[in-house]
Amino acid sequence: MKITSRELTDIFQKHVENLFPNKELKPVEITVATNENFGDYQCNFAMINSKIIGDNPRKIAEEVKNNFPYGDVIEKLEVAGPGFINIFLSDKYISNSIKKIGEDYDFSFLNRKGKVIIDFSSPNIAKRMHIGHLRSTIIGESISRIYRFLGYDVVADNHIGDWGTQFGKLIVGYRNWLDKKAYKKNAIEELERVYVKFSDEAEKDPSLEDLARAELKKVQDGEEENTKLWKEFITESLKEYNKLYKRLDVHFDTYYGESFYNDMMADVVKELVDKKIAVDDDGAKVVFFDEKDNLFPCIVQKKDGAYLYSTSDIATVKFRKNTYDVNRMIYLTDARQQDHFKQFFKITDMLGWNIEKYHIWFGIIRFADGILSTRKGNVIKLEELLDEAHSRAYDVVNEKNPNLSEGEKQNIAEVVGVSSVKYADLSQNKQSDIIFEWDKMLSFEGNTAPYLLYTYARIQSILRKVAELNIGLNENIEIKTENKIEKSLATYLLAFPISVLKAGETFKPNLIADYLYELSKKLNSFYNNCPILNQDIETLKSRALLIKKTGEVLKEGLELLGIPILNKM
């Protein structure tokens, strides 16, 4: 299915090139009209090309309009202000385009060469996921879905933290203070407990730190017993993580943890030294940057031979470069890691690895009492957050529809609760800090998941009533857009793929949320002003098909945010 703005762009581009030959014109730009009174789309061609053409922009716009080859797509053009061209789509084009909704959109104009690696979530083994993991996990999942929708070949990678000094401490804690019953019941929770226990005991007996280093060395050397324990910790942790990923509807193609790259880091450092990118500095291997880069030096190997996160991340890029036909890498982490990514991105550029790299950073989540801190022991676990959302959503569902079966209430509560948490995050600018307010998140009014889910369920309720009348909705129905409110809804449906495209280009899922909220408002205005069921048969069919296609767009948009739909609420 052609994207309306692209189709209009092609029509205008061909027209102005014929109208103004032998001119190096700036490309035509078509945007959705900001005010419905000024058409469906707008073009500023005359404004941006007046100097090139050598004439007044208003006069240029009039010339474009007066010589325009009208066809089935455009009904009329109007010139406004200093030279804007307002575009009004034909009713026939709108109707035919809406009936095509459900077909794949044509994004062939994008440069989709090579794979896109999206690196997100990345929890640390033997630690339960907490609220701080939410943003990377669900924003990364949404960006993965958006890129797949746009036709890119995506690899979603969970770069888990499965290596480091904590494993020596865990092994000491496991052997000295493990509660086997608790471990069997919830391994990762018990591992967290013994890790804290180790820290407490090590304050009293510092020799435990030496013991932990010795146990870690055994893991690093591949000693059988400790290696077996290390792998067990990973397996048990992933079991718990995958339960949460299933609940959040998050999916990964690969789980290459930090340990996977251990054997590659020596070669990375050697290459950096051989290319004189890294130099010896008091026994350590360090990369110094140009003053204009405004970056601190980056240590890639300490004087004791140990490697750092930067070394591991450079090795990761090298592996991906050599393994995949990779064109782009996208990383999702919080804002605190910005300097780290600037450093290692610059190093990979210095190595001549021509790959697009993006660090998508985000703010933190807050509640009324401020930032959640693990040091204070009050960090909210992700499972606890989702359980609380479920419980609160259940109370709302039970109050609004007490006649539902218990199974229906529980299912709706899970969808509404988890979706409310996800949408409260995804509907915000990712670089802003998020303040969770339960009443606001679970409200059926405003820009919330319950409002969008209810809008979709309402569509399905009306379509069920249409079906009970034995009225079929097929592609032969002409969708009428004579009514201003009908046309507003209909033309807005055609803007959906552009909102997805912009969300992908800017890594902002909130642009899709903004679109869906505006679409839902237009739909509810349509409900209130354009009756469906008690109308003549042609009007009924037209309006029923229009809301059916609206439901399809709403569903597709929610899926891009990782939010499932409900047919009943």
From Swiss-Prot:
Record-level GO cellular component terms: cytoplasm
EC number: 6.1.1.19
Annotated CDD domains: Anticodon_Ia_Arg (cd07956), ArgRS_core (cd00671)
A biological-process GO annotation: arginyl-tRNA aminoacylation
Motif ('HIGH' region): 123-133
SUPFAM superfamilies: Anticodon-binding domain of a subclass of class I aminoacyl-tRNA synthetases, Arginyl-tRNA synthetase (ArgRS), N-terminal 'additional' domain, Nucleotidylyl transferase
Keyword Nucleotide-binding: yes
UniProt KW keywords: Aminoacyl-tRNA synthetase, ATP-binding, Cytoplasm, Ligase, Nucleotide-binding, Protein biosynthesis
Reaction(s) catalysed by this chain's protein: tRNA(Arg) + L-arginine + ATP = L-arginyl-tRNA(Arg) + AMP + diphosphate
Enzymatic class: ligase
InterPro entries, per database record: aa-tRNA-synth_I_CS, Arg-tRNA-ligase, Arg-tRNA-synth_N, Arg-tRNA-synth_N_sf, ArgRS_core, DALR_anticod-bd, Rossmann-like_a/b/a_fold, tRNAsynth_Ia_anticodon-bd
Superkingdom in the source lineage: Bacteria
Compartments where found: Cytoplasm
Signal peptide (residue range): none
Pfam families per the UniProt record, alphabetical: Arg_tRNA_synt_N (PF03485), DALR_1 (PF05746), tRNA-synt_1d (PF00750)
Location, primary (coarse class): cytoplasm
Listed GO MF terms: arginine-tRNA ligase activity; ATP binding
Family (UniProt): Belongs to the class-I aminoacyl-tRNA synthetase family.
Subunit organization: Monomer.
Database matches in NCBIfam families: argS
Listed name of the protein: Arginine--tRNA ligase
Taxonomic source organism: Fusobacterium nucleatum subsp. nucleatum (strain ATCC 25586 / DSM 15643 / BCRC 10681 / CIP 101130 / JCM 8532 / KCTC 2640 / LMG 13131 / VPI 4355)
